[in-house]
Regions:
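Terminal peptide-recognition signature
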Residues: 6, 32, 40, 67, ...
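Solvent-exposed loop/turn segments at secondary-structure junctions
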Residues: 12-13, 29-31, 43, 49-51, ...
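Gly/Ser/Thr-rich loop/hinge elements
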Residues: 146-218
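Short acidic catalytic loops
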Residues: 43-47, 106, 125-144, 222
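PDZ/PDZ-like domain segments forming the peptide/carboxylate-binding groove
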Residues: 2-52, 113-118
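C-terminal, low-ordered peptide segments at domain boundaries
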Residues: 47-131
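Loop/turn elements at helix/coil->beta-strand transitions in domains of secreted/extracellular proteins
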Residues: 39-41, 73-77, 101-104, 129-134, ...
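Extracytoplasmic/secreted envelope proteins and their assembly/folding machinery
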Residues: 20, 116-123, 149-153, 219, ...
Length: 254
């Protein structure tokens, strides 16, 4: 994808049209990181113009951009050229010791099929190092591929539920549409399962997550108003099987 390698949230500024972009994430190795942009920076201008409701949507489409960044006491110009790069959605994974327990932290930003191998690797590490509780940070995750959240769920759910292929999610539609889906061969149910097949860029891949089931007893989910779709689905699907505490704002509801 052609990108500057950062994400942001929009906030209304002084006038009815004026906006401020607040940097929420800067991808490692991106033009944004190389230009010195950091999480929490306030962006108030784009190409010598204030950012407004009329022009903020231009930013992702521009091949180059000059951003005006507001600091505590001054402003500085940040220049960037967009590049084609993979934005790794596994932003951060780490392990902490708390009250004689090991707690894993996974900041996951998009259910992207290209991230499956890294997700499996991270979950294997959590398992091997004895992680018993997990903080899953989905605050900026607006969704993605349904098979990928099924794969992650199969590494988070209790191992016995995965071994039984318990129902993870069930789609409910009117009878006509359900029949149409059946004729297309699209299942109405997704199961917890140790082996999954995904199609990535036209190629089929088989993933085995049986050695990557972490065995956690509790999941803490960090959410926000940007948390949507697949991010909401994984929390709904895991609730019957896992103790989940949701922390944050009301999710988008997509």
């Amino acid at each position: 994808v052609t990108t500057y390698g950062f994400e942001y949230a929009l906030y209304q500024a002084g006038s009815s049209k004026q906006l401020v972009l607040v940097t929420t994430l800067v991808y490692p190795g991106s033009p944004a990181e190389k230009a010195g942009l950091k999480r929490g920076n306030l962006i108030v201008g784009l190409n010598n113009e204030p950012i407004t409701t009329d022009n903020y949507q231009q930013l992702p489409t521009l091949a180059s951009a000059e951003l005006m960044v507001q600091t505590h006491s001054s402003q500085k110009v940040v220049k960037m050229q967009a590049v084609s790069m993979y934005e790794d959605p596994v932003v951060l994974d780490s392990i902490y010791r708390w009250e004689n327990k090991k707690v894993g932290y996974l900041f996951y930003n998009k259910f992207n099929p290209l991230s499956c191998e890294k997700l499996i690797s991270v979950c294997k590490r959590f398992k091997n190092e004895g992680v018993s509780e997990l903080i899953l940070d989905l605050r900026y995750n607006s969704g993605g591929n349904s098979k990928v959240h099924q794969l992650l769920a199969s590494m988070l759910a209790p191992e016995e539920n995965v071994a039984r292929n318990d129902v993870y999610l069930k789609r409910v539609h009117n009878k006509d549409y359900e029949e149409e889906l059946r004729q297309k061969g699209e299942p109405l149910e997704q199961l917890l399962q140790p082996q999954l097949e995904l199609t990535i860029e036209g190629n089929k891949y088989d993933y085995d997550v049986s050695d990557a089931n972490i065995g956690i007893t509790k999941l803490y989910a960090l959410v926000s108003g940007k948390t949507a779709s697949a991010s909401e689905a994984i929390l709904i699907g895991l609730r019957p099987y896992l103790d989940i505490e949701i922390i944050g704002e009301t999710t988008r509801g997509k």
